[in-house]
Amino acid sequence: MCEVKVFKQEDGQETLLLKDVYLIEQEDEGLRFETIFGEQKVYKAEIESVSLTDNKVVIKEKA
């Protein structure tokens, strides 16, 4: 399985939000993330970048 870490981009810094994310879905209120442990989070954000080689997703707050 290919899980990713989700980071928030803010003021030039990346902050780790979630680990072991296997599902990302676009919803009306933003992005929904689900981990392999069943934890779910929704962020009012958009994807800034995705690195498959680093298993990393960077999001930023919606303007």
Segment roles from a protein language model:
Residues 2-63:
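Compact, glycine-rich, soluble single-domain proteins
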